[in-house]
UniProtKB/Swiss-Prot annotation:
Lineage of the organism: Eukaryota, Fungi, Dikarya, Ascomycota, Saccharomycotina
A GO term for molecular function: rRNA binding
Chief localisation class: nucleus
Source organism per UniProt: Saccharomyces cerevisiae (strain ATCC 204508 / S288c) (Baker's yeast)
Function: Required for biogenesis of the 60S ribosomal subunit.
One GO-annotated biological process of the protein: regulation of cell size
Full protein name: Ribosome biogenesis protein SSF1
Comp. bias regions, Acidic residues: 442-453
């Protein structure tokens, strides 16, 4: 299969500063119990669809991976948020921990119930599946039920907890600039609603479908019934006039859930229509300056151009708003959360707030002293470990140095021994030659070696 072509020439590339300002996330599972849960695995995959495109969509966890392994990689990869799904071995409760890297804090929620995306599609009449174009931009974040101002009957601690949660949710997606953001690029919405009475937080993920509305819904049903025989015609025997059918809003109760509601119809100004009207007005204002007779025009050559007047800008050109209907289709997953605690750091630090456990000031001071003693002991052990490592390294380096010196000494001794052996071999060869030629008599007749004539 051929690889799909990507736009490179006209696509706007982000600068390194802009890429650094975009928040990125990782959605992972931590713990042996959570890795063995198949439904939780599918929930993690569905939650990654929400966080697209700035998330690790194809991340695979191993049983040997620990939380520290992911935290270490957050810095080089530029990850700003960690979403950790865990499951307790004793109770089996599923928890969602949202941590801000690298300093924290970490907000822990208990997942009361959740529904997967495939379960939601079974109950929808017209389910929607996401394409690659639908996840090119992050979803629109909508927060409802959260208040950062102090109300009557609320403590300062509750207000601070609310501020931490709101700031945590607001920073998981890049901020929108109304002047630069195109409305057509926003195709998804992530809704987070808090119930003020129970304190439960519900998460929903929807797809935004915008359709143009030119006629009323009742007339559209009549047009569809004309072209499609399977569509049922509304019962008109109780209607006196056709206007009663058009103006009757109670007829909408008999339509399906997937159709667009009248309350969702808004008026939107489209810039493309303004540009089109402006171009049409310019064309209509263009008139020839020189009017010649037909005989003179026939004599002119084809190379001559007819001079045109400069068009005047139309003062009465105003954009006409169009009616557009907004329809939301749920994609999933659904989550219902309950706040448990807020702690410093990434899953290891001082507990700033706990929803179910309340400590007195004396208990808090005792815990702080115990924590300080643990930190001092940890630093002491760390220093001892570093000193031991340095000692072992020094011993190892000294051993290597002695080994190199022995090798050099052996090489030098081997060179001297080889020189002595060569001298002894030369003496032996010279003595053997003298002994061989010494047995030849001196008065040997020289005619034996004379040349033959």
């Amino acid at each position: 299969m051929a690889k799909r072509r990507q736009k490179k020439r006209t696509h706007a590339q982000l600068t390194p500063e802009q890429e650094q300002g975009i928040p990125k996330s990782m959605v992972i599972r931590v713990g042996q119990t959570s890795l063995a849960n198949h439904s939780l695995n599918q929930l993690v995959k569905d939650f990654r669809q929400i966080m697209q495109p700035h998330t690790a969509i194809k991340l695979k966890e191993r049983k040997s991976n620990k939380l520290k392994d992911f935290v270490v990689m957050c810095g080089p990869l530029g990850v700003t948020h960690l979403f950790m799904f865990t499951q307790s071995e004793k109770t089996g409760n599923v928890s969602l921990k949202i941590a801000r890297t690298p300093q924290g804090p970490t907000v822990t929620f208990q997942v009361l119930d959740y529904s997967l995306g495939r379960d939601i599609k079974k109950f929808l009449k017209r389910p929607k599946s996401l394409n690659n174009d639908d996840v090119l931009n992050p979803p629109l974040l909508v927060l409802n039920g959260f208040s950062t101002s102090k109300r009557s009957g609320e403590d300062d601690q509750d207000v601070n907890v609310e501020k931490v949660i709101v700031s945590m949710f607001q920073n998981i997606f890049p901020p929108l600039n109304p002047a630069r953001t195109s409305l057509n690029s926003i195709k998804r919405v992530f809704m987070i609603n808090k119930d003020r009475e129970t304190g439960e937080i519900s998460m929903r993920h929807y797809f935004i479908d915008i359709r143009e509305v030119e006629i009323s819904r009742n007339l559209k049903r009549l047009y569809k019934a004309k072209n499609n025989l399977s569509k049922t015609v509304p019962n008109l025997h109780r209607k006196e006039d056709i206007s009663s059918l058009i103006l009757d809003h109670d007829l909408g109760a008999y339509t399906s859930e997937s159709e667009i509601e009248d309350d969702a119809i808004v008026r939107v100004v489209d810039n493309q229509d303004v540009k089109a009207k402006h171009s049409q007005s310019l064309k209509s204002q263009r008139t020839p300056v020189e009017k010649k007779d037909n005989k003179e025009r026939e004599k002119e050559t084809e190379e001559e151009d007819v001079e045109m007047e400069e068009p005047k800008p139309s003062e009465n050109l105003q954009p006409t708003p169009r009616k557009k209907a907004i329809k939301l289709t749920e994609l999933g997953p659904r989550l219902t959360l309950k706040l448990v605690k807020i702690e410093e750091g990434i899953c290891s630090g001082k507990v700033l707030h706990h929803e179910f456990v309340q400590k007195s000031s004396e208990e808090i001071k005792a815990l702080e002293k115990r924590h300080a003693a643990k930190m001092r002991l940890k630093e002491q052990r760390k220093k001892e470990q570093e000193e031991n490592i340095a000692k072992k390294k020094a011993v190892k380096d000294a051993k290597k140095q002695r080994k190199l010196e022995r090798r050099k000494a052996r090489a030098a001794e081997g060179g001297e021994g080889q020189g002595k052996d060569d001298a002894m071999s030369d003496d032996e060869s010279s003595s053997s030659d003298s002994e061989h030629y010494g047995s030849v008599p001196e008065d040997l007749d020289s005619d034996l070696f004379s040349e033959v004539e």
